[in-house]
Amino acid sequence: GLNGDAFEIWAKHIPLRAVDKHRDNLFQIEAIFFGQAGILADKDGDEYYLKLKREYEYLAHKFSLTPMDVSHWRFLRLRPNNFPHIRIAQLACLYHRSYHLLSQLMEKNSLKEIRDVLRGGTSEYWVNHYTFGGSSISRPKTLSDSSLDLLVINTVVTFLYAYGIHKGDERLCARATAFLEELKPENNYIIRMWKQCGLNVAHAGDSQALIQLKKEYCDKK
């Protein structure tokens, strides 16, 4: 996505040991997450912003944190639901609610159960905000099924299969493969290109294979 590189940089700036000490406090998780994203650098803002900023400054001093440069984030051509603020707020809420998240995901046997774990939400502030400041119509900011499915394809399935290989657990590998075959194929320009060549793309397993073929045999030429 547009902010894929920015989120990778952000993830490397998140001190998980420090965050884990404050897992039971969503406000403090938000302070670290937004602060490390460089989004709390402005001096002025609404009441919630200023509270987060003060909390981040305290935690940054406590854990010797250094934020990323805010210039990495992109907003043009993004729908409000995809703004970095909303995604970070959703991740903070998921981290807060989902203790032992990986073990939870390994225990789930259906896509519905996995979607329910990942669907998340946000703190109350983000119900009627897309960024800090101006309010919007109240609307819960949960992930759509299509967004959840992309998360499952690119994160959960990959983790389950790799962990299954690492542990020699064929059941985990089989479950990961079954999830891919149950999910609809991605709809992007790579898959549309393959379809134009006459290939049948039945499920996400097919689309992932075709994306990998393009990366290995087309992009490297």
Model-flagged regions — what are they?
Residues 209-221:
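Cysteine-cluster motifs in flexible loop/terminal segments that predominantly coordinate metals
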Residues 1-209:
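Hydrophobic, aromatic-lined core segments that form the binding pocket/scaffold
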